[in-house]
């Protein structure tokens, strides 16, 4: 999920975020980041499903045209 980020890099990112935002804001930021990622994944899945449906409909139309000829 994080690509080539290892544990030391993640700890450094967390430490910098802790210094910048403080311990009281960090849970709120994490929650909001989690919601954003969830929404992005949901949107991405919906787009993929829509494209798959559109592709199937196009294939069905092409099949009907071939059968009519």
UniProtKB/Swiss-Prot annotation:
Organism domain of life: Bacteria
Which family is this protein grouped under? Belongs to the TatA/E family.
A single GO CC term for this protein reads: TAT protein transport complex
Q: Which organism is it from?
A: Alkaliphilus metalliredigens (strain QYMF)
- Protein name (database record): Sec-independent protein translocase protein TatA
Main location as per UniProt:
membrane
Question: What residues form the membrane-spanning segments?
Answer: 1-21
List where in the cell it is found.
Cell membrane
Function description: Part of the twin-arginine translocation (Tat) system that transports large folded proteins containing a characteristic twin-arginine motif in their signal peptide across membranes. TatA could form the protein-conducting channel of the Tat system.
Which residues are the signal sequence here? none
Quaternary structure, from the entry: Forms a complex with TatC.
Q: How does it sit in the membrane?
A: Single-pass membrane protein
Q: Which Gene3D superfamilies match?
A: 1.20.5.3310
Report any Pfam family annotated for this entry: TatA_B_E
Gene Ontology MF: a single term:
protein transmembrane transporter activity
The UniProt entry's GO biological process terms, in alphabetical order, are:
protein transport by the Tat complex
Question: Which InterPro entries has this protein been placed in?
Answer: TatA/B/E (IPR003369), TatA/E (IPR006312)
Keywords, sorted A to Z: Cell membrane, Membrane, Protein transport, Translocation, Transmembrane, Transmembrane helix, Transport
């Amino acid at each position: 999920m994080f690509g080539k980020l290892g544990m030391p890099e993640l700890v450094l990112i967390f430490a910098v975020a802790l210094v910048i935002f403080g311990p009281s804001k960090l849970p709120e930021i994490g929650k909001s980041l989690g919601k954003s990622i969830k929404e992005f994944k949901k949107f991405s899945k919906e787009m993929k499903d829509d494209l798959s449906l559109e592709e199937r409909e196009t294939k069905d139309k092409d099949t009907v045209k071939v059968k009519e000829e």
